[in-house]
Amino acid sequence: PDDSVPTQLPSESMTTEATTPSQPANPQPVSQKPAQPTSQSVSQSNSQSVSQSTSQPSSQPTSQPINQADSMVGLKIAVAQQQFIVGDVINNAKKMVELAKDARDKGANIIVFPELSLLGYPPEDLLLRPSLASRVKLAFELLYTVKDIVMLVGYPHIDPNGTFNSVAIIHNGQQKGFYHKQCLPNYGVFDERRYFNTGHNQVLFDYQGLPIGLLICEDLWQDAPIRTLKEKGAEIIISLNASPFEQNKQEQRKALLKSRATEHNIPIVYANSVGGQDDLVFDGGSMVVNAQGKIVQEAPRFLQHTLYVVARHDAQSGQVILSEQRKSPLALSQIAETYQALVVGLRDYVNHSGFKG
């Protein structure tokens, strides 16, 4: 229930600070550039039309500028590898508010949350409840209280055309735009086609002249979405994910990100979920890969953690340069990662179920 306070994973006390911190849609592309260096803007462009009728608040894309007081010496992105409880929409939103404020105070310009983080993953038949839309609306009102940082929030978008696995672009009390997941997995533990409609809106949003492309999990495992974003001018990709643990899965993710980054010559920010939910365990391992396929930032496995990276546009090379972390987390052996998965899965099942003793 929304008024409960679920037991959370222990948070890692240390965050990886990057060096030199800075402080549905219309079918025709919208492009706005800031008029001066101190004006930061977000605008959205879509390749195809989607429904503009929705029960969610302020979900129609806009090109209203984002203005902030300080000029940007680098775009600082916070990757919130955190646990969000399935169905606990209001408390999930409250947690996002606190995380966003903390990231803003550390100089972040954007904070990225995992796939469907507002509702939790996998939500399954909760998506069929008529009350869901009103609960999401209340949660958005909480998110709108955060100022001076862009929030990329995974949420269920519900309108007369269906239910979509989406990401909202939120800033200063407004939803500036949204993106609907295009590739819905329907194999193994995934059953997304039962609940979600396929999205068709390729989304770029502009931040201080830097075109950012958005993807959600399975979109990255297929080549077409990232290829299209690159062709439309994206210079960095941000992907929201709820990728569950399997043995050797982290190595598969790393291989995928390196391949996508080098093939399309574009850096990728990969935000993953963490924690146990019923029969699934999410192992985190969020990371940032540069255009040459090098992992420049990596979060620890099985721990809540906020990762920071600074992206700067290099005038000479024309590429986005990413800050590198000073020390990578220790790699886990297959035995160690399996043990951690068992511990997290059992602990969170007991805690979420409210068992005593």
What are these regions (language model features)?
Residues 1-10, 14-34, 39, 44, ...:
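Enzyme catalytic cores with a strong preference for nitrogen-chemistry domains
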